[in-house]
Amino acid sequence: ECIGHRRSCKEDRNGCCKLYTCNCWYPTPDDQWCKCLL
């Protein structure tokens, strides 16, 4: 499992999530967080 700050799920394709399912939630209007799960 990998958790990281991302501006969007699409951008995270270049990060740790690229082989996993990316679930995003929005702690603030200006930020998104991705949690990558197997």
Swiss-Prot record:
**Which residue windows are coiled coil?**
none
The record's disulfide annotation reads 2-17, 9-22, 16-36, 24-34
Signal peptide boundaries: none
Task: Give the UniProt keywords, A-Z.
Answer: Disulfide bond, Knottin, Secreted
What domain of life does the native source organism fall in? Eukaryota
Q: In which tissues is it expressed?
A: Expressed by the venom gland.
> Where is this chain primarily localised?
secreted
Q: Does the keyword Lipoprotein apply?
A: no
Membership in a protein family: Belongs to the neurotoxin 02 (plectoxin) family. 09 subfamily.
How does the entry describe the domains? The presence of a 'disulfide through disulfide knot' structurally defines this protein as a knottin.
Query: What is this protein called in UniProt?
Result: U9-ctenitoxin-Pk1a
Output the lineage of the source organism: Eukaryota, Metazoa, Ecdysozoa, Arthropoda, Chelicerata
